[in-house]
Amino acid sequence: IIQKAKIVGDKTNGFFDITLGDIKILKGFYVNKKKIKRIDTRNFSYKDITLSNGNLIKKPFGYVNIDLSGIAKGYAVDLIYNYLKTKSITSFLINIGGEIKVHSKKSDFVTLGVDDPTKQHQYIEEILINDKAIATSGTNVDTLNYEGEEISHITNPKTLENISNLNLLVSVIHKECTIADGLATGLIAMNPSEIISFSNDNNIATMLTIFENNSIEKYYSLEFMKYVKN
């Protein structure tokens, strides 16, 4: 999972960074938070995390907190998917916290709905996939009030600031749910105006949803449009 996280870090130009644990601890996103000093600058990133002897993780400093929450659910989905593929199961769908991967031998594609963030049990889009995954990251999930401002758990690793726009969703389709999960987390940390252009430049299947009250705006990368049900 560390190796996959570093791959996603590279794919997002560093916007997905597993060394942001200290920022979340400082802001209060973890119940068992430690006492740490305010962080204004950092001299390390995910690039400084190394693996040796197969599974030995080496950190640049002892106080670096590795946070895998932005990729762990997708990784778990892939583990289950790979296990089920070894069994005589015709079709299955795995869903862990909204990170989904499907397999079907009965049909070429499986229809999935992308949830409407403003209404329960309704969809804003339908997609057709098979042996692929879709993962979604939202700034409206896991928020808290920090120094008088409502902030998201999503952190911009370039500025070390948590995203304050709580009306964003990013969905990514990829053959690996691990990668889709990490990409969605990294992309949503970017400036919203750059997400689709970055996705197009890097052939990422991305859907950006901006919502407020009952108003919804949807934007698609060219790669994502291949999966939209007409």
Residue ranges and their predicted role:
Residues 1-230:
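Mature catalytic core of soluble alpha/beta enzymes
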